[in-house]
Amino acid sequence: MPVTCGDMIVNVMNLPPFEAPVGVQIKRAFPGDRDKILRFIREHFHEGWALEAETALLQVPGTCFIAEEAGEILGFACYDVSALNFFGPTGVRQDARGRGIGRSLLLACLWAMRLKGYAYAVIGGGVLPQNRGRHVYSRW
């Protein structure tokens, strides 16, 4: 039986402009945000992603972005955690989905990867049917 990984390769030299949803701040996470971010991920997602995000927070510069509204975390996205050029993990709180937050977090990471000198990024599982973000990923 053939194995399908579902990874997607994205050309980061051809990205649309970055834009955050109205009222939402997308920012690079700092080590001081660690406890708040890890608590958010554990509450809304799972421990494995929290461990990966912690690795992203320890890198210099950090490779994790968060979306906040009124000081409350709505989502997160990381890159260069499991491998260089690799996007993820990422997640948006269920009640905040459908507002373009995931797209903005993705673009923040892809633009950061471009500025780091990458020409391409790998989105793990980007084309798998169960990936809620695959419709966004397929635009590039």
Description of each model-found segment:
Residues 1, 94, 123-134:
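Conserved beta-strand-loop-alpha-helix junction that forms the acyl-donor binding cleft
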Residues 1-22:
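Acyl-donor-binding surface of acyltransferase catalytic domains
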Residues 1-3, 137-140:
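Conserved acetyl-CoA-binding loop of GNAT-fold acetyltransferases
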Residues 24-36:
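A short beta-loop-alpha structural element at the N-terminal edge
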Residues 37-41:
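Hydrophobic alpha-helical core bundles mediating ligand binding, dimerization, or RNAP-core interactions
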Residues 42-94:
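A conserved beta-strand-loop-helix scaffold within acyl/acetyltransferase catalytic domains
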Residues 92, 98-113, 135-139:
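Conserved acetyl-CoA-binding loop-helix of GNAT-fold acetyltransferases
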Residues 119:
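Short acidic/polar active-site loop segments enriched in Thr and Asp
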